[in-house]
Amino acid sequence: MRFSPSNGLMYKRALVANGIVFDKARPVSHQRLHMNGNNSGRLRIFTWHIHGSYLYYLSKGNYDIFIPVNGTRSEGYYGRGETFPFGPNVIEVDAADVRNKEFDCILFQSERNYLIDQHDILADWQKRLPRLYVEHNTPVQHPTNSRHVMTDPAVKMVHVTHFNKLMWDNGGSRNVCVIEHGVCIPEVSYRGDIPRGIVVINHIEQRGRITGWDVFDEVRKHVPLDLIGMGTSGSGGLGEVLNPQLPEFISHYRFFFNPIRYTSFGLAVCEAMMTGMPVVALATTEYVTVIKDRECGLIDTNIDRLIEGMNNLIADPVWARQLGEQAREVATSKFSITRFVTDWENTFRQTIQHNYEKGNSIYQ
């Protein structure tokens, strides 16, 4: 029997049987054939430039990432920028032209992306594409009772730590997963020849207690510390060090100090551990599952004990190097860039396939 669109259900079954999924969510002029959820082709991901470091590591995967750019370079519309050495798979799209482009899925990275940006620049048919939302942060309003702004169970929620997933109220959705950080192995290794600690936090004073400004301000009275990051010059810091130069810069310091009370596990911490640097941190959020006290760093909620430990690291470079070697082993195992991009590509593909299988079910 010859199948044609006029055969209705039989024609649809024939398409499914042959592994072809037809995207009905788009108007005829924008329709695209997907073979098994496009499992065989190179994916086209649309997202915004929100966190440069995260986007850089995400771009190490085997897919293409499209990001919008506008004339004012407003939040999320910076394009590639000049800070990170993005490869050719990070592609700028004029914000006004986004609605005319073909993508396999949409990745939200902030409340603004989800509540405002998508409605400003995406066509209606694009807003029905497979969608994911990566939540980079811990809950802000309340540590346990904050309902996430993204409440659509059809959108895949991705948390960057298990602590974040535990604390956010995701509305009971089962469409939630965790993809832990991944960073590249740096070309430099830990030296530790500067007998001081290094702190890497943007706008630490302006962000207050969350980023531990008061903790840092107290500790630096007792321990030699340097501070770098955007907006730190007025807080006694050295200013910003661009990400490509960061591993070389921090590798000379004896240890990395993270005074942050309540945020996600920092990429700067992952990068420091990957160089073989010991990390000193508060025993909060995801840090307690990664840093083992006096094995690969120092971790505690007692600031006096941390001060004592940091001064011991200053006095004993051999001990600092031993802790740093263990930190590198942990980082290599836990924060592999290969595992990270594989997790993301699998999540993209599974989300796309699930979307089209559901949308093209012969039983609907």
Go through each PLM region and give its residues.
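A charged, aromatic-enriched C-terminal amphipathic alpha-helix characteristic of glycosyltransferases
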Residues: 315-357
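Conserved catalytic-core segment of nucleotide-activated headgroup transferases in glycan assembly
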Residues: 67, 167-170, 182-240
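A short hydrophobic beta-strand element within the catalytic core of glycosyltransferases
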Residues: 256-257
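Conserved acidic donor-binding segment of nucleotide-sugar-dependent glycosyltransferases
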Residues: 293-304, 312-318
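Extended catalytic core of nucleotide-activated donor transferases of GT-like folds
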Residues: 51-54, 63-154, 163
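Short hydrophobic beta-strand element within catalytic cores of glycosyltransferases
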Residues: 278-281
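Aromatic "clamp/platform" in nucleotide-sugar-dependent glycosyltransferases that forms part
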Residues: 261
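Short alpha-helical segment that forms part of, or immediately flanks, the ligand-binding pocket
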Residues: 247, 270-274, 285-289
